[in-house]
Amino acid sequence: LNAGHEATVNTLGNGLHALLTLDKSFDEIKSETENINDVVEELIRFDSPLQFFQRYALEDVEIGGHNIKKGSKVAILLGSANRDPRVFKNPDQINFKREIKDHSSWGGGIHFCIGTHLARLELGVSFNHILAKQFSLIEEPSRTGAFGIRGFKELLVSS
């Protein structure tokens, strides 16, 4: 279970921070969402802990007018794709009723996250418990600065 541990932990931290900095109470959030899965998917889209992956091109390909040669190392910017305004209406806003739920945080194809179902379950249970209480930030947290994994050094909250 270690492979997905950091991603799930940082999704919880990023998601809790996003919930606490919204201009809505937890009660308002609960009243406008029918399914905790909508909360999970929108929070991981909004602030994905895994911002990018490196891959190697398996064949020559042209993307957006750029030629990429077979064997070239490429960076897949998942966090950027999740904020693409050509795909998501108002991508920099949290919308738990978002019609398009197909984001890139879980990867795709042969690289789709094998632990997705477990992570969704863990995140759903956790956010259900979080939304059942009232929390507030004690102080604004600082990011870890880790390359590739987006999260906080610590997230101090009170209930």
Residue ranges and their predicted role:
Residues 1-159:
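Cytochrome P450
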